[in-house]
Amino acid sequence: MMRENRIRRAMEIPRTLKLADGTAVAYRVSSAEARRPGRVLVLLHGLASNLTRWSEFVEHSSLTARWDLIRVDLRGHGGSPARGLLTLEAWADDIAAILDREGHAHAVLVGHSLGAQVALAFAGRYPDRAAGLVLIDPLFRGALGGRSAWIARLAPLFRAAAGIARAGNALGFGRKTLPALDLRELDREARKALASAASTEAFIRHYSSPRADLRYFHTAHYLQEMAEMFRRTPPLERIRAPVLLLLSRGGTFADPVLTQRVAAQFNDAEIVMIDAEHWPLTERPVEVRRAVAEWCARRKLR
């Protein structure tokens, strides 16, 4: 199995797409053994994250035999440095450009947290190109609670603060370089520690800590993303693509019961509950891979 994983990593090809505005978006492509245009999963990470969040998924997924897998460093993240405003619309347009380059008219988008919001924005902006959506702990405005609801209400202040930070960057203030963040290794260490209630609380504090995120992420981008993450989604009843929702029972940022009620607005949705807090790719990676593969097979998205 270890040898097989090394082979899969070797077969994954890193690519960069230079966009019209000068931004270079980095992504990696794992081509299926039986490749077919349109049979592709685009994997989208969360806030202040990067494509290494999906390393284990790509290495171990049973989908690699029949599906292309594309994991993206959203602009402003990881290997896709960017200046200026980060928006859901810009990320959606970047994904469309990547699909064009790779020869796919449509795709199944798999997004975690902020990545789920990007997937929804893509489906709203490019309805004919969204063949399906897998939303891992999406953040619907009607289901937010606690700190998340507070952040959503203060979104205009976060946007204003982000603008001030960008102005400072333009004047030469701010960090020029950031250390690399390998989430695959971070996730491995986290799983070793997740053995008690106390360690679970420590895990939540660390994985939701702005201080920890800002070690690896620009302040202006972080403030802007805090506003983007809690924007209202496109009308869910207008999304024609089938949807799979993977919801954490812990409900760290959103109430899972309220999330299910909001999700009832989709025309065609299935829900799978997972014993996790908000990071099932870290906490329950095997369950996530199984749920996605079974859904793709059951819905005949192949």
For the regions a protein language model found, what residue spans apply to each?
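Active-site loop/oxyanion-hole signature of alpha/beta-hydrolase fold enzymes
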Residues: T23, R28, A65-V110, L114
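Conserved HGGG/HGGXW glycine-rich cap/lid loop of the alpha/beta-hydrolase fold
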Residues: T23, R28-P81
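Residue in the alpha/beta-hydrolase core beta-strand immediately N-terminal to the catalytic nucleophile
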Residues: V108, A131-V134
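Short glycine-enriched nucleophile-adjacent loop
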Residues: A116-P127, L133
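Flexible "cap/lid" loop of the alpha/beta hydrolase fold
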Residues: G124, L133-F173
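Conserved serine/cysteine hydrolase catalytic core
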Residues: S208-A264
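Catalytic histidine neighborhood in serine/cysteine hydrolases
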Residues: Q265-H278
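Catalytic histidine-centered segment of alpha/beta-hydrolase-like enzymes
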Residues: A276-R289
